[in-house]
């Protein structure tokens, strides 16, 4: 009878590397993670409205954010548009909408434009203008596993009707992108959805957030993900009889190998110093994806980011992550050409 002998360093090293990838990636199978469009399909008919939230937000007055748009599933019946909302976006030209790459993705593929409508000119899904989409452009380096290069453009079939009040948002000058490295900078997030109490709201909501140091943000997210691996670690310890003094070293190795999941293409924003007694902090959630992260100066709104991803919603120290628009302005300008 032969006794199987395991090389402890190889076992722990291989597990650490595999677990590190699991920490940094977000894939759910070969077709990638479920996207807002997929989740909205599943949600229809459900009594749970918690798919979309701006935590700690206020109702936006009519006309306050005239550039904000809603992405709808095209099969929505007239008058029922809100229930088919799955992402946000921003009007950047008469016939161009900026949104997130994951908003135009379903089962790993780019959505056909016939499956999307855009609703403009309303904060409450009343008396707005519903427009068909002609073309969908997702960034060529979009990475679903890491939600990287998370940006897309929609070419509309026509401009909004003249009687509908809309406005185009200014986009960040790429040469001024370095200002977004300063923690504490005030920004605004906008989106539709339920309040933090879970009551459904058809009114556009907004709240303020601050830029958070990217390294701090990254570390908080990794530590949160690492806790979910504790059960797996326990199983490995039992199977391979790893000494207790090695377990903490394995855990640290996992974190070290996971790298920067919040990279230079992203902005982290939230409540840097939340009230210790707070049950939630100002944040966006899934249904707000694709909407704008806005800087305001002298009553001028400038879009600096796009709602992209996060760990949960409104969780203290787990801040929202946004596409850093300044890194993609060359692509935006070259794509939205007419």
Give the ranges of each region predicted by the language model.
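Protease-domain processing segments flanking chymotrypsin-fold serine proteases, especially trypsin-like
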Residues: 2-98, 106-111, 116-117, 229-261, ...
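Conserved catalytic-core segment of clan PA serine endopeptidases
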Residues: 55, 116-162, 172-176, 183, ...
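Extracellular trypsin-like serine protease catalytic domains
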Residues: 70-74, 205-338
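Active-site-proximal beta-strands of protease catalytic cores
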Residues: 96-101, 180-195, 294-312
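Conserved H-D interstitial segment of serine endopeptidase catalytic domains
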Residues: 39, 71-74, 97-100, 104-144, ...
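Residues that flank catalytic or metal-binding motifs in active/ligand-binding sites
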Residues: 65-67, 87, 114, 132, ...
């Amino acid at each position: 009878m032969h006794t199987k002998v395991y090389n402890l360093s190889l076992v722990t090293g291989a597990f650490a590397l595999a677990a590190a990838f699991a920490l940094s990636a977000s894939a759910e199978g070969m077709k990638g993670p479920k996207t807002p469009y997929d989740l909205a399909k599943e949600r229809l008919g459900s009594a749970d409205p918690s798919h979309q939230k701006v935590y700690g937000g206020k109702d936006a007055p009519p006309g306050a954010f005239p550039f904000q748009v809603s992405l709808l599933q095209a099969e929505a019946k007239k008058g029922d548009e809100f229930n088919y909302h799955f992402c946000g976006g921003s009007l950047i030209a008469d016939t161009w909408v900026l949104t997130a790459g994951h908003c135009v993705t379903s089962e790993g593929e780019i959505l056909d434009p016939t499956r999307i409508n855009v609703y403009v000119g309303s904060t409450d899904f009343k008396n707005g203008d519903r427009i068909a989409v002609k073309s969908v452009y997702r960034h060529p380096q979009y990475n679903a596993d890491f939600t990287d290069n998370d940006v897309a453009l929609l070419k509309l079939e026509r401009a909004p009707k003249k009687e509908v009040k809309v406005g185009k948002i200014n986009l960040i000058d790429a040469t001024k992108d370095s200002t977004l490295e300063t923690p504490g900078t005030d920004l605004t997030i906008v989106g539709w959805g339920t309040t933090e109490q879970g009551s459904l709201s058809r009114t556009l909501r907004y709240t303020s957030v601050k830029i958070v140091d990217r390294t701090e943000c990254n570390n908080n997210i990794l530590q949160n993900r690492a806790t979910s691996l504790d059960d797996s670690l326990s199983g490995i310890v039992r199977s391979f009889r790893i000494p207790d003094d090695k377990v903490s070293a394995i855990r640290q190795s996992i974190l070290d190998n996971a790298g920067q999941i919040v990279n230079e293409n992203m902005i982290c924003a939230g409540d840097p110093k939340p009230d210790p007694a707070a049950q939630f902090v100002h944040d966006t959630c899934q249904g707000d994806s694709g909407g704008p992260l806005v800087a305001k100066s002298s009553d001028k709104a400038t879009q600096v980011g796009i709602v992209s991803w996060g760990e949960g919603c409104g969780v203290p120290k787990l801040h929202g992550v946004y596409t850093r628009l300044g890194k993609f302005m060359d692509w935006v300008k070259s794509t939205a050409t007419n």
